[in-house]
Amino acid sequence: MKKGVLLNSEISAVISQLGHTDQITIGDAGLPIPSLAQRIDLALTQGIPSFISVLNVVTQEMQIEAAFLAEEIIGHNPLIHQLILTQIKELEKQQGNSITVDYISHNVLKEKTKHSRAVIRTGEHSPYANIILGAGVTF
């Protein structure tokens, strides 16, 4: 049995196969998932698992250098927005690098998910709780 924090075999496999600048998306329960992207559906019921809990586990396994958020999150979901920014700041300290955060429209974010290696669906039921993570390198 795997000893690490991330136990989900599909997510673990995707992260292990990422190269520099490859992307994965973590989304709320309503984010449309492109038919060509690998769909990893974790949603059990409303709020389970939460977006933040999935983000916390994924970022413990994945080296991050960039993040894309829908600009609408600022006004429509300030709590999740602040939790994301706090997580990114902590991750910068742990990784020893800067993480670029870009804000794009929700429609552009949905289009951009087409380039993700995988889209992880959570049970999150709050608006604009979506992020695209860009992989960095550990050296």
Curated annotation (Swiss-Prot):
It holds the Pfam family RbsD_FucU. The active site is at residue 20. GO terms for molecular function: D-ribose pyranase activity; intramolecular lyase activity; monosaccharide binding. It is found in: Cytoplasm. It comes from the Bacteria. Belongs to the RbsD / FucU family. RbsD subfamily. Homodecamer. This is D-ribose pyranase. The gene is rbsD.
